[in-house]
Amino acid sequence: VMRINFIVIAKENGTILWEWRVATSSIPTDKQIWFHNPSEVKPVYNSKYLLVTASGGAVALIRIADKKVMFYAYAGANPHSAELLPDGNIVAASSTDQQISIFRTDTLAGTGKAVETYPVSAAHNVVWDRMKNLLYTTAGNYLISYEYNFDKENPALVNRNEVYRLYGEGTEGSHDLFPVYGEYALYWTTNGKIFKYDIVSDKCSIAYDIKEIKSISSGPDGIPTLMLQPTESWWSDHLIDPEGNILFQKQNYKIYKARWIIDNTFSYPPIHLINE
């Protein structure tokens, strides 16, 4: 869960288990503004690390155990999401400059710059498909894929392809793209609805007729689907399930995205270790 300018791991009952604040981190003072308004928080490497972005420009990989920032970089104007590639390199999506950027993740130097950028209309999301070795992102109402060159030292995205296009009412304004737990499918949220794209059948259906969902995260049986629907501007102090029931609430929180701490085998192998 992200609260204004810091990141927390919490129980549903509101108990805070862990938090990370840039002000008390190793990030240089002049770079801390990059971490203003966190915008993504993906559990990676068997939920031992968090891959985060912030609207101020940051992308970062943070180790949960000791809160160490393993790598950080400037990822453009208003980053909304990031993804790990199989070799540990990172891709980030930034919406204001409408691009995705690729980084060589140098955990020895601890920082770096984008190796290359690629234009993507209103870029808001990036998801790796480990079965097909494809990177997905949305561009307007299109689902786009890229291939990766698997060159860790000189990473590049190639062979852009338009995979699927949404038509009709409620399809404008793509926002979150995230794997459906236990399925070979993606949740795809827009200004008007939540769609589910089935990769095998290449078909898209309406999963939930709910507007303005900024983040969605599902889990195994017994774990409700977690959503953020703004109640003020882009944020809310609570998270809901598809029926609108409040799953988590914290007074004065300005939450933008939330993810269950659950291994994501759509994007990463069951045993997923960082190469430091």
Set out the residue ranges of the language-model regions.
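Aromatic (tryptophan-biased) beta-strands that constitute blades/sheets of beta-rich domains
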Residues: 9-34, 63, 68-75, 113-116, ...
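Short coil/turn segments that connect the beta-strands within blades of beta-propeller domains
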Residues: 46-49, 87-89, 131-133, 182-184, ...
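Structural signal for beta-propeller blades
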Residues: 4-7, 58-60, 98-101, 143-145, ...
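Repeated scaffold domains used in trafficking and secretory/extracellular systems
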Residues: 29-42, 76-85, 120-128, 168-181, ...
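Loop/turn-rich, solvent-exposed surfaces of beta-rich toroidal or solenoidal domains
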Residues: 170-241
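Conserved beta-strand positions in repeat-built beta-propeller and related beta-rich domains
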Residues: 1-3, 44, 51-56, 92-96, ...
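Solenoidal tandem-repeat scaffolds enriched in leucines and small polar residues
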Residues: 102, 110-112, 117-162, 175-179
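Short loop/turn segments immediately following beta-strands, especially the blade-tip
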Residues: 10-14, 104-109, 146-157, 199-206
